[in-house]
């Protein structure tokens, strides 16, 4: 049973990484800026992975836009999600959010990448880990823009991943560095932060969801990423979500309250995650591969494997064909202009 997504150290594939990626527990990998030099190099790295690892791997990346864009040189400058609401008219916002979703997904698919973990559905801009990655502080605006972005992704042939369930936007702490606590009442969370997830699930827009490494203290003592309450009771039963549940990176400090890397992995799977991310912790990956035992006899095995298969890219796009497409060319300039305008607005605020 393949459940783990791991990372690569550098810009070329090492033999040890071929062996790790070939392990039966490994379902795929996630690429980072450290793996990228230019488009030709990243395409060659991906080609090497596909050729040397003799099984289908889900290749993923965080190419959200704005400050979370792992590949920049030679790619569209994608706007921060907040930029749509702050720089465009109401009609333009939805139109260009859709184009951004399409542009991002088409470029990644043309590299032979299956999935970019997007969009961010967190409300508000106060959390330093989220900031302008969020579309809006307003539920209706966030849902409208996220719907358009996802429609663009789907049109290009990429599955969507809503994050960070049930909402990371109201904590100031960064879960990369510590475990944040959200002490608001269940009613506050359900009437606000949960709404983008709930509404997009009801519209059948979300193919996958990534929970937060945040403890919602009035609801459960575990981070959402390791919480049966959030993943089984709320996400699966109450919201009737049928798609894939990814853990956020189990190497993050925010996951530390769940124990060592093997314990974190077991807790996340038992809580309801289908696929686990473990990054920047090579020894941790080896520990998990040596000690995590998953078999076809375990509950939900077939459902989890079917969900994994649903995430692979749904079409093939040739890079040269893409960049000669008029839609891509128009978007390339317009989306960069939106981000430039947004950066100017931020710079003026800081002056």
UniProtKB/Swiss-Prot annotation:
Reaction catalysis annotation: Hydrolysis of terminal non-reducing N-acetyl-D-hexosamine residues in N-acetyl-beta-D-hexosaminides
Keywords: Cell cycle, Cell division, Cell shape, Cell wall biogenesis/degradation, Cytoplasm, Glycosidase, Hydrolase, Peptidoglycan synthesis
PANTHER family the record matches: BETA-HEXOSAMINIDASE, BETA-HEXOSAMINIDASE-RELATED
Positions of the catalytic residues: 176, 248
Protein name, per record: Beta-hexosaminidase
Biological or metabolic pathway of the protein: Cell wall biogenesis; peptidoglycan recycling
Quaternary state and interactors: Monomer.
GO molecular function: beta-N-acetylglucosaminidase activity
Binding-site residues, substrate: 62, 70, 133, 163-164
Function comment: Plays a role in peptidoglycan recycling by cleaving the terminal beta-1,4-linked N-acetylglucosamine (GlcNAc) from peptide-linked peptidoglycan fragments, giving rise to free GlcNAc, anhydro-N-acetylmuramic acid and anhydro-N-acetylmuramic acid-linked peptides.
EC number: 3.2.1.52
InterPro entries documented for this protein: Beta_hexosaminidase_bac, Glyco_hydro_3_AS, Glyco_hydro_3_N, Glyco_hydro_3_N_sf, Glycoside_hydrolase_SF, NagZ_Beta-hexosaminidase
Native source species: Haemophilus influenzae (strain ATCC 51907 / DSM 11121 / KW20 / Rd)
